[in-house]
């Protein structure tokens, strides 16, 4: 695709740019502020488009399947969507349980497929929306982002509902919620199915 075809990110990678830092705030999963300034969703999206476009954020070419089963190839620019989705996902990692994240990701993908196929009026979409709404009750906090040409980096996440802050340990460094003996017993229980299968097969 020719460079002049890009609308939001023309020549985004031609010249070096200094890193730009911003903070995106969410309330129950909804983006509500940028750099501490409250904004309605439309204004916030328009602002992020202007902020991320010059860095080539959300710019790409996609090959996918159409509803009719044919292949399609499109060039797209979606800086606001890229920033919001990435920031929102990092906030969810901090406040949602592992099972919540996995189930939400599964149904969100299915929901997207339904909408893409024109099935958004099917009652199952209301069921999925109820689950997604429930899952967002604690998705509140601030996400610090750093923009560089072609790169979106998450610098930090803060939330009053942080599950990391609720533990006494530091991930990858030390544990505060269990003892070495607890860890030994837990490891033994987790490995028990494999131990029994090996024993039943005559292997030691």
PLM features per residue range, with description:
Residues 1-204:
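Nucleotide-activated chemistry modules centered on ATP-dependent adenylation/adenylyltransferase
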């Amino acid at each position: 695709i020719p460079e002049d075809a890009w609308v939001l990110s023309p020549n985004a990678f031609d010249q070096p740019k200094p890193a730009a830092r911003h903070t995106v705030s969410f309330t129950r999963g909804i983006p509500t502020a940028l750099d501490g300034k409250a904004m309605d969703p439309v204004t916030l999206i328009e602002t992020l488009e202007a902020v991320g476009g010059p860095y080539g954020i959300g710019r790409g070419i996609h090959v996918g399947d159409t509803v009719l089963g044919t292949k399609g190839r499109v060039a797209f620019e979606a800086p606001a969507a890229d920033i919001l989705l990435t920031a929102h996902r990092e906030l969810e990692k901090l406040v949602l349980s592992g099972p919540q994240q996995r189930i939400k990701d599964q149904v969100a993908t299915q929901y997207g497929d339904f909408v893409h196929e024109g099935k958004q009026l099917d009652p199952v979409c209301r069921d999925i929306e109820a689950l997604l709404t429930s899952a967002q009750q604690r998705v509140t906090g601030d996400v610090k982002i750093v923009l560089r040409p072609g790169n979106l980096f998450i610098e930090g996440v803060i939330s009053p509902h942080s599950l990391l802050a609720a533990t006494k340990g530091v991930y990858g460094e030390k544990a505060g919620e269990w003892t070495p003996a607890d860890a030994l017993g837990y490891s033994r229980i987790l490995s028990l199915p494999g131990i029994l299968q090996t024993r039943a097969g005559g292997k030691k």
